[in-house]
Amino acid sequence: MKASELREKSVEELNAELLGLLREQFNLRMQHATGQLTQTNQLKLVRRNIARVKTIITSKAGV
């Protein structure tokens, strides 16, 4: 997901996206802990996407 795509969304849509990403991160962490996760780079990608969404939410709140 690109930052330019996220900037076009409303704050409500971004909050929904953030909630979905946090759930995905939780599921990936559980899979990693039980040894079921084969693509460990997914954790890094989701964490960065969460940071992108939070950054854009903060920038929209400041405007």
From Swiss-Prot:
The lineage of its organism: Bacteria, Pseudomonadati, Pseudomonadota, Gammaproteobacteria, Alteromonadales. It comes from Shewanella frigidimarina (strain NCIMB 400). This is Large ribosomal subunit protein uL29. One of its GO terms (cellular component) is cytosolic large ribosomal subunit. HAMAP family: Ribosomal_uL29. One of its GO terms (biological process) is translation. Disulfide bonds: none annotated. GO terms for molecular function: structural constituent of ribosome. Keywords: Ribonucleoprotein, Ribosomal protein. Belongs to the universal ribosomal protein uL29 family.
